[in-house]
């Protein structure tokens, strides 16, 4: 699944005590001055993004981020029209501290009181020791609600940008909880494939960042795993007979497009240089998949097939569901 999110499983033993040298303070446990200061820094980065001030953001980033700023810059430029004139509100704040002298292979932080609405966990690979903050902002834009998660690191007494994650919180006008409820309804109706795909949509939308989790989210990951159809490429590629031809399917996942929620199918192809042949294969895959699983007609507005070479180069075709026959 594109952008696959990490499921963090919390065991009772780990919850009983914090990881050695790794502590977290949730917003409700912070003193007011610290919480306000972190929120103000996050708001400043949002304001710079709304102005398109990528130079200023880069200057106020840690060295690792400033030397690899291309992805953040592209996101800021793309979203500037949405953020210009918008207002941001702080939803949640977390202060993370990691002791030591070497990067931590898998730093684990447990924040807040377990069972409370503010409890959260973070699992961050290869984290250098230091003091960090995670601030999540809610933003109302002309294109709907967005969330901006800023990762801050204390550097020389100042909080600098160490991560920037900005994205919509809805697909086709619906949030993650809506997709979760739809997934459960599809499961109850015996539409296992639509159910699983809607679980994936919910899990794309619910966590602000892929290294954050909480107990209810862990339960949803469990639900999704149990709902995974055996004939889908969940644990590796699967071979399907589609439109009279055998195809090796690598990935199947939902995605929002301008036309609404679409189903994306990635399959293996030795060569896509013959675009006419690739187009024909794409249409075979699209039509064959819908014929194999008719329930998809009600679940998706369209289907995308992407013939993918071993190099990763691909050739894609989008077909509206009304045109799949």
Per-region residue spans from a language model:
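Surface-exposed, charged secondary-structure patches
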Residues: 70, 77-145, 173, 231-272
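Short, low-complexity N-terminal intrinsically disordered segments enriched in polar/charged residues
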Residues: 20-51, 165-178
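Short solvent-exposed beta->alpha transition segments
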Residues: 25-33, 39-40, 55-119, 205-232
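Alpha-helical segment of the N-proximal tetratricopeptide repeat
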Residues: 47, 174-194
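Positively charged n-region of N-terminal signal peptides that target proteins for export
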Residues: 1-5
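Bacterial N-terminal signal peptides
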Residues: 7-17
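Short beta-strand edge/turn micro-motifs at domain boundaries
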Residues: 22, 134-174, 253-273, 284-323
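TPR/TPR-like (Sel1-like) alpha-helical repeat modules
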Residues: 192-209
